[in-house]
């Protein structure tokens, strides 16, 4: 199994911790500092943080939770981390909260976002997250192999 599938599987396990609701997706996220990245002196990847939808109080998303939990600790160097998320990060929030794409960009720590499945247009039509990330110089990669599992986890309770 590739490293990408291993980390996406871990993000999927996070998604399964979500309390299902018909009005939101169940998403999981894992933040990784890859081996060889600035700030990683170990001979292996380091998992820095994890998160899942509604893990923290309020209407929180998986990426938001993982980033907020990370900020409580020491931040990795700029443009060094990778975030794996079972569904592409939101580019817009119906609640008015800061979209996850904006949080990822503003943090300055991410060089790559790896997604398990594209966001269905159930709540937001035409998610512009990918375009925003790429415009900010952050790589956007679709990890093939767990799409069905990611979508099933996301839509649990719908």
Predicted regions and their residues:
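Zinc-dependent deaminase catalytic domain
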Residues: 1-158
């Amino acid at each position: 199994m590739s490293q990408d599938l291993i980390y996406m599987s871990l993000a999927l396990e996070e998604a399964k911790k979500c309390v299902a609701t018909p009005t939101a997706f169940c998403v999981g996220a894992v933040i990784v500092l890859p081996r060889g990245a600035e700030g990683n002196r170990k001979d292996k990847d380091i998992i820095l943080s994890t998160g899942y939808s509604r893990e923290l109080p309020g209407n929180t998303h998986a990426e938001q939770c993982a980033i907020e939990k990370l900020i409580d600790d020491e931040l990795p160097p700029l443009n060094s981390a990778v975030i794996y998320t079972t569904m592409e990060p939101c580019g817009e929030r119906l609640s008015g909260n800061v979209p996850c794409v904006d949080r990822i960009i503003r943090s300055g720590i991410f060089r790559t976002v790896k997604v398990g499945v594209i966001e269905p247009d159930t709540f937001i039509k035409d998610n512009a997250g990918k375009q925003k990330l790429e415009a900010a110089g952050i790589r956007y990669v679709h990890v093939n192999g767990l799409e069905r599992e990611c979508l099933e986890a996301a839509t649990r309770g719908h």
